[in-house]
């Protein structure tokens, strides 16, 4: 049987005060890149969104080394997404006792990092078979035809 191993860690930043559109501009540049390359790109880009994203990438790498014992050289950003958050509404006083509404947008940023050195699946049958070599393993399914390859599905 194949058991799924967790090879991904994430860091989530909520209610970051910037528009989701401006944060997506930076996130699109780092998606799918390695950890070291991402840090280098974020340090050199001139956008205000780089600093909170840098902190999230650094936090996700710290989660990977703490929870899974991963090396930072093996980490790759597998998923990075920006969602629109709540809009803070403020009033700006204007002339003649009037006021204008100001909308301050927020966003939620999720960074998911994957360790490429770990296998995603663990074959528990091979581990059990190596411990008990007398175990008979047959690879036949109850709903297969006798000729082999056709499944009995409509």
From Swiss-Prot:
PANTHER family for this protein: CHLOROPLAST 50S RIBOSOMAL PROTEIN L22-RELATED, LARGE RIBOSOMAL SUBUNIT PROTEIN UL22M
Organism of provenance: Helianthus annuus (Common sunflower)
Keywords on record: Chloroplast, Plastid, Ribonucleoprotein, Ribosomal protein, RNA-binding, rRNA-binding
Molecular function terms, GO-annotated: rRNA binding; structural constituent of ribosome
NCBIfam families in the record: rplV_bact
Cellular compartment(s): Plastid, Chloroplast
HAMAP family: Ribosomal_uL22_B
Protein name stated in the entry: Large ribosomal subunit protein uL22c
Gene Ontology BP terms: translation
